[in-house]
A protein has these predicted regions:
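Short, low-complexity N-terminal intrinsically disordered segments enriched in polar/charged residues
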Residues: 1-45, 124-169, 177
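Surface-exposed, charged secondary-structure patches
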Residues: 59-118, 199-274
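Generic preference for hydrophobic/aromatic residues in regular secondary structure cores
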Residues: 13-16, 53, 62-65, 71-72, ...
Length: 284
């Protein structure tokens, strides 16, 4: 058993407050340590009943979905870092978990994810999400640009973490709340080159054997209906974000609208590709 008690200095690395470089008071911090100690133990032993009281209703719902995502287990040393953001919420970051799925007769697909636990002001876990990864997180948290402050960085990071988690856990009801009713959603798919013996008319979709991207345009309702079918037809879906560019669109003077362009590696039991996700997000 590679579990280390969070009371050990080797198991928990106490980080500075991300907003003002002040350590959380020892008595205040200890509450979070005790909660995470019990949660980590429950994940390892699969005795989840003992931690239900540490979650809000919504937080417990997401936690139950996350631990049912394939075969879940903690990997690494179980080290957790505590951060207090501009909103005052405390998040426990750095925990790595692996999630494995059987593929075909003898195959296995495993994803390793950073898992983030977010606490409310009553020290209850109100949300659990997959982290963005070091590169994407640093691109947001270290960015200096007009319209940016610590609150903006926190909101954007949280939004993208929840977005990624919702698709992986097939949380269609949550995804419905992300898009506006007037949203236009364009989805691209890689069309594989046709074999050499196909007709000339069929070959016209592929130039010199290169992959072609097929685009489909949806309104919100048709996109969600299609996404529901995708969720039903795939045992697993996983999204991994890489580099990103985020810009505040200053022309919306009375609103905080951000253009997000982020590298995305999409993997499912039936299809996989790499591309870019572009979102216009109104943070007003």
């Amino acid at each position: 058993n590679d579990y280390q008690s969070p009371q050990s200095a080797d198991a928990i690395e106490y980080k500075l407050n991300a907003s003002d470089n002040q350590l959380v008071a020892d008595t205040y911090r200890q509450k979070y340590i005790d909660v995470m100690d019990t949660v980590l133990s429950a994940i390892r032993t699969k005795r989840y009943g003992q931690v239900m009281s540490f979650f809000t209703f919504e937080g417990l719902d997401v936690f139950n979905e996350l631990i049912a995502y394939g075969t879940a287990r903690i990997v690494g040393d179980g080290k957790v870092n505590f951060f207090q953001g501009a909103s005052g919420r405390v998040s426990a970051r750095g925990l790595q978990m692996s999630f494995s799925f059987n593929v075909g007769r003898n195959g296995k697909k495993t994803f390793v994810e950073d898992v983030v636990f977010t606490f409310n002001e009553d020290c209850k876990i109100e949300n659990v999400s997959f982290g963005l990864g070091e590169q994407s997180t640093n691109d947001i948290l270290c960015r200096e640009a007009p319209g940016w402050n610590n609150a903006t960085r926190e909101v954007l990071t949280t939004f993208l973490e929840n977005y990624k988690t919702a698709y992986s856990l097939k949380r269609l009801d949550y995804i419905k709340t992300i898009y506006s009713d007037s949203a236009v959603i364009i989805v691209g798919n890689v069309v594989r080159p046709k074999p050499a013996n196909t007709s000339s008319s069929e070959m016209s979709i592929s130039a010199n054997g290169q992959n072609i991207i097929s685009y489909n345009r949806y309104d919100k309702d048709s996109y969600l209906a299609n996404l529901k079918r995708v969720f039903a037809n795939n045992e697993f879906i996983n999204i991994r974000f890489t580099n990103n560019e985020i810009q505040w669109l200053e022309k919306f003077e009375d609103r905080k609208v951000f253009a997000i362009n982020i590298g995305q590696e999409y993997s499912s039991s039936r299809y996989a590709d790499s591309g870019y996700l572009f979102l216009l997000v109104d943070m007003t």
